[in-house]
């Protein structure tokens, strides 16, 4: 019985303390049982398994405790086994009907799991049990005494959780975010059936949307993109009027002034940008070709800026000044830099200067304007004139001042600038520039950050810094530690031959940024550039990383330069030169002073400046060396040209002489070998010297042709004398002209002003005044556009006469009166008629009498016609009659040829006829002629041609032309037309053409008297008819 009592579990003391014990449910009441109706038998078996394991553990422990008890017989053991089976069956039924609420475990039962909670979701219940098993159940304080030794270590997991939370609380936010990303982030690629797509298939094609470039206001590209983004938010997809563009972006920089919009149609772009400021969609858009789309979207890696790096300023007062980066903003778009200020503290301020228009460009923005030198900020200087603008500010370290709205710390200007306003590539800071940024340490010495400087120089090393044969060393990369000599350079890749190590003799390629020159102590080197010690020679005494310290050959001082600025050299620095300077070199001391070197010392230079003063300066005080100009020209006191190498003499003063060594503006530096002072160098002015001898035998006199601007105005002296110059107002002023040559060819304008060579023309088309050479202008008629000849000048002969016309003759053309040059008028005593004559007019051809306009004499070239009155057409016979009539007196006005000299008629009284005859005023000369005389042109009865007796003059007495008097007959018809027959014809006379009394067969040319037969030709006797 006692054994059976021990086998039963009566519960712990906790059951007695439980105020609300669990109600016992009747096994017959199925509704009160909290079992799930859908659970199967397998689940029930799994739920009761832990209870079975617990009972077995308890039974084993009790059996161990009762090992010393008396033995029992086999029957009792069988009964015990039966009782155990019955208890297990009751436990199974109790486990199934046990409610959800769990009682607190205590004592030893804490270590045993006697029940399994059943929930609606089996999986969630199992997960909760696993978590409780890991973290451990809650312990009651009273149970601590019942725990065995070491049981308190069960809260190990609690302490571990506390430590984990403390560690997470002490973590940085970035590290915590990284840890969470690693823990909960996606650590594997998404499941996909797609294979790797080649990049060429990702390129845009004609099926993809197009990209349109739209013009916008430069500098407003980002604002336009933000406005498009805002409009897309206002008109999303699915709204009544959605935005149909796909994307929009801008590139800036070289592509400023354009934004790029991706869309299917151009109309969609215009609709999206309609009524938007700073963008011009109505202008011509640019359709980006498909092949250029990848280049448009390609992004280049921006330069990484680090604090302590070196940059230069692009524009403004500090243009090209070196600056050091103090801080970089998180977005990388702005930096804080430290630079040496340029301030004048108001010393050069003009109080009376007018107010500067804010729209105009500020003086500080123009690099050409003189700017103050670089100096550290001085509050003492600022207080002198701008004390009201100066105030002290609190800073973490050093002296901080606010002056004119800017901050100065330890004398440096601290300024916030955008990255696009900085030069970040190929900065190449010089050592003297970096020295100004040296920070003072506590012991008073300067502390120069060479590490950041070297890093900047490595990124800006030029490719031409390495020449074949330079010893180099690879200091970073996979090939670090290799030593060799360069053999060739291709861009930024240098090929070198390894000289040391296992790879000796092999050629390898290395980038320029991973190389540095290698020197050893004792090498003789030369500074090649990038430093103020350029061309300095010396011996290497110390090498430390990228810096080399050498001992100068001339100054015997140690200087430190970068290895990239050095090169091995076999030259020596003790040849009378100090670096790049030699005796007799012309150097620039400042903006207004030049000097000639007269002596070179070990550390200094002795110079003679343009004012005649002797100075001793250091090589660093020289601004630059002036290259001698061999073609420089000046003029001496007499105006003669002087050049380099000419010998000149001083006129006033000491009257020194010498050979011209340098010509600089109005100063001459002369060299005299006989003078020992100042190495024979003297300085004089050009206006105080005269030429003694010119180099090469050049003429020493002034070139007068070049001194006369009138001779040089047309390209040089000419052999012909030009036309006389006119005075007064130029004739071309006010004329309409056209340009016939040059850039304004074909344009028409009006001359507003004119000189000897140039004319100021106001062009009609451009409405502006231009200066054009006169020789390129042609005068035009403003109405008809015809060219007007302007070369005759004013005061030329008037046509038809220079004399004023009389009132009754004014209507004639060309006019009649005193001048006989008129053709064909008549009147008065001056016969202008051709071929007739009248009075003493000698203008007839071949007229007679007065001297002039006669046909030349065949027998004497000095005479025209014959004698003093040789106006007659030549003929034979002593009187040289024209055409026939004997040897009448030539002294009479009516000599033998008075009638015959006319062509072809005669009669002085009927001079109005052209030509005719009339009256009894025929010549009293003999009408007899020899038998073989040619009757040319007529005789006493010769028919006049074409005029008649009362033929009208041509053009007439007054206005009507050609008619004259009322009874005048038209010309050529006449009363007696035949010409030139004579008074008595011989049978063999040539009938040319007819006469008044000609035979019936004379040829009537062109007419004869009124009773003549004009109907047809006449025939001589015996002449066959045609």
UniProtKB/Swiss-Prot annotation:
Compositional bias segments (type: Basic residues): 98-107
Superkingdom in the source lineage: Eukaryota
Biased composition (Acidic residues): 61-94, 114-133
Organism: Aspergillus oryzae (strain ATCC 42149 / RIB 40)
UniProt-annotated location(s): Nucleus
Compositional bias annotation for Polar residues: 905-926
A molecular function (GO) term: chromatin-protein adaptor activity
Family as reported in the entry's similarity comment: Belongs to the SPT5 family.
Main location as per UniProt: nucleus
Pfam families, sorted: CTD, KOW1_SPT5, KOW2_Spt5, KOW4_SPT5, KOW5_SPT5, KOWx_SPT5, Spt5-NGN, Spt5_N
Keywords: mRNA processing, Nucleus, Repeat, Transcription
Gene Ontology terms: cellular component: DSIF complex
Protein name as it appears in the record: Transcription elongation factor spt5
Residue numbers spanned by region Disordered: 1-172, 694-729, 788-859, 905-1026
Function noted in UniProt: The spt4-spt5 complex mediates both activation and inhibition of transcription elongation, and plays a role in pre-mRNA processing. This complex seems to be important for the stability of the RNA polymerase II elongation machinery on the chromatin template but not for the inherent ability of this machinery to translocate down the gene.
Gene3D superfamilies the UniProt entry points to: 2.30.30.30, NusG, N-terminal domain
Cysteines paired by S-S bonds: none
One Gene Ontology biological process: mRNA processing
Biased segments, Basic and acidic residues type: 1-11, 30-39, 48-60, 153-172, 1015-1026
Assembly, per entry: Component of the spt4-spt5 complex. Interacts with RNA polymerase II.
Residue stretches making up the KOW domain: 305-338, 519-553
UniProt keyword annotation of Transcription present: yes
SUPFAM superfamilies, alphabetized: Translation proteins SH3-like domain (SSF50104)
Ranges of compositional bias, category Low complexity: 712-726
């Amino acid at each position: 019985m006692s054994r059976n009592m021990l086998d039963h579990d009566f519960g712990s003391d906790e059951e007695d303390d439980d105020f609300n014990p669990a109600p016992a449910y009747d096994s017959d009441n199925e509704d009160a049982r909290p079992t799930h109706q859908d659970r199967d038998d397998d689940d029930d078996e799994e739920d009761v398994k832990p209870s079975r394991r617990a009972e077995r553990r308890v039974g084993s422990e009790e059996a161990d405790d009762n090992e010393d008890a008396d033995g029992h017989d086999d029957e009792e053991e069988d009964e015990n086994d039966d009782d155990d089976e019955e208890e297990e069956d009751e436990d199974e039924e109790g486990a199934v009907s046990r409610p959800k609420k769990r009682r607190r475990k205590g004592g030893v039962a804490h270590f045993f799991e006697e029940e399994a909670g059943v929930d609606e979701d089996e999986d969630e219940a199992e997960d909760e049990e696993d978590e409780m098993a890991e973290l451990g159940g809650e312990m009651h304080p009273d149970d601590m005494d019942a725990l065995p030794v070491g049981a308190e270590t069960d809260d190990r997991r609690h302490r571990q959780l506390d430590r984990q939370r403390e560690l997470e609380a002490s973590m940085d936010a970035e590290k915590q975010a990284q840890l969470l990303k690693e823990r909960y982030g996606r650590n594997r690629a998404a499941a996909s059936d797609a294979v790797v797509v080649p990049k060429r298939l990702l390129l845009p094609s004609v099926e993809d949307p197009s990209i349109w470039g739209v013009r916008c206001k430069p500098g407003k590209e980002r604002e336009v993109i933000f406005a498009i983004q805002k409009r897309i938010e206002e008109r999303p997809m699915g709204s009544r009027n959605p935005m149909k563009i796909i994307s929009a972006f801008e590139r800036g920089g070289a592509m400023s002034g354009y934004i790029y919009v991706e869309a299917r149609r151009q109309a969609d772009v215009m609709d999206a940008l309609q009524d938007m400021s700073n963008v011009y969609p109505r202008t011509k858009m640019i359709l980006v070709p498909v092949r250029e789309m990848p280049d448009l979207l390609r992004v280049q890696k921006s330069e990484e800026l680090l604090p302590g790096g070196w940059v230069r300023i692009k524009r403004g007062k500090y243009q090209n000044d070196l600056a050091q980066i103090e801080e970089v903003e998180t977005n990388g778009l702005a930096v804080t830099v430290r630079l040496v200020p340029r301030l004048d503290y108001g010393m050069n301020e003009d109080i009376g200067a007018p107010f500067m228009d804010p729209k105009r460009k500020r003086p500080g923005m123009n690099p050409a304007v003189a700017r103050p030198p670089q100096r550290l900020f001085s509050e003492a200087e600022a207080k002198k004139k701008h004390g009201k603008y100066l105030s002290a500010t609190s800073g973490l370290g050093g002296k901080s001042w606010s002056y004119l709205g800017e901050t100065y710390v330890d004398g440096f200007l601290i300024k916030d600038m955008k990255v696009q306003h900085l030069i970040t590539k190929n900065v190449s800071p010089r050592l003297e520039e970096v020295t100004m940024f040296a920070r003072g340490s506590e012991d008073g010495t300067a502390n120069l950050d060479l590490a950041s400087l070297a890093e900047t120089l490595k990124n800006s090393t030029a490719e031409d810094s390495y020449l074949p044969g330079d010893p180099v060393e690879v200091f970073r990369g996979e090939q670090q530690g290799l030593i060799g000599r360069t053999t060739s350079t291709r861009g930024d890749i240098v090929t070198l031959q390894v000289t040391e190590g296992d790879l000796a003799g092999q050629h390898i390629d290395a980038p320029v940024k991973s190389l540095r020159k290698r020197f050893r102590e004792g090498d003789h080197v030369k500074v090649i550039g990038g430093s103020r010690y350029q061309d300095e020679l010396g011996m290497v005494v110390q090498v430390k990383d990228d810096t080399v310290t050498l001992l100068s050959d001339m100054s015997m001082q140690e200087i430190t330069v970068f290895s990239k600025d050095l090169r091995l050299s076999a030259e020596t620095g003790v040849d009378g030169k100090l670096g790049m300077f030699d005796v007799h070199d012309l150097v620039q001391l400042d903006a207004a002073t030049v000097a000639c070197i007269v002596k070179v010392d070990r550390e200094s230079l002795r110079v003679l400046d343009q004012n005649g003063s002797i100075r001793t300066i250091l090589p660093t005080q020289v601004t630059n060396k002036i290259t001698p100009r061999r073609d420089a020209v000046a003029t001496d006191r007499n105006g003669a040209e002087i050049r380099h190498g000419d010998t000149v003499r001083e006129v006033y003063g000491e009257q020194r002489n010498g050979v011209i060594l340098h010509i600089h503006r109005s100063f001459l530096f002369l060299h005299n070998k006989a003078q020992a002072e100042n190495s024979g160098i003297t300085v004089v002015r050009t206006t105080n010297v005269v030429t003694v001898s010119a180099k090469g035998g050049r003429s020493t006199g002034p070139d007068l042709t070049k001194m006369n601007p009138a001779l040089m105005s047309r390209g040089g002296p000419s052999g012909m004398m030009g036309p006389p110059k006119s005075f007064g107002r130029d004739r071309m002023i006010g004329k309409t002209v056209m340009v016939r040559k040059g850039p304004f060819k074909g344009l028409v304008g009006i001359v507003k002003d004119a000189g000897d060579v140039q004319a100021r023309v106001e062009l009609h088309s451009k409405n502006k005044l231009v200066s054009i050479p006169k020789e390129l202008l042609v005068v035009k008629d403003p109405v008809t556009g015809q060219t007007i000849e302007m070369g005759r000048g004013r005061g030329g002969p008037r046509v038809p006469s220079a004399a004023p016309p009389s009132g009754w003759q004014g209507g004639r053309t060309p006019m009649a009166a005193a001048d006989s040059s008129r053709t064909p008028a008549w009147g008065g005593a001056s016969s202008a008629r051709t071929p007739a004559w009248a009075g003493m007019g000698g203008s007839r051809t071949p007229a007679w009498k007065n001297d002039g306009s006669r046909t030349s004499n065949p027998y004497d070239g000095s005479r025209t016609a014959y004698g003093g009155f040789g106006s007659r057409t030549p003929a034979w016979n002593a009187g040289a009659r024209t055409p026939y009539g004997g040897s009448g007196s030539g002294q009479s006005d009516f000599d033998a040829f008075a009638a015959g000299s006319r062509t072809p008629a005669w009669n002085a009284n009927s001079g109005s006829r052209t030509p005719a005859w009339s009256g009894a005023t025929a010549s009293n000369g003999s009408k007899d002629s020899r038998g073989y005389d040619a009757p040319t042109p007529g005789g006493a009865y010769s028919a006049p041609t074409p005029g008649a007796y009362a033929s009208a003059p041509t053009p007439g007495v007054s206005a009507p032309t050609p008619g004259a008097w009322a009874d005048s007959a038209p010309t050529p018809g006449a009363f007696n037309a035949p010409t030139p027959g004579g008074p008595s014809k011989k049978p063999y006379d040539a009938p040319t053409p007819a006469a008044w009394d000609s035979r019936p067969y004379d040829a009537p040319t062109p007419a004869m008297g009124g009773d003549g037969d004009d109907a047809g030709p006449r025939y001589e006797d015996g002449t066959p008819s045609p």
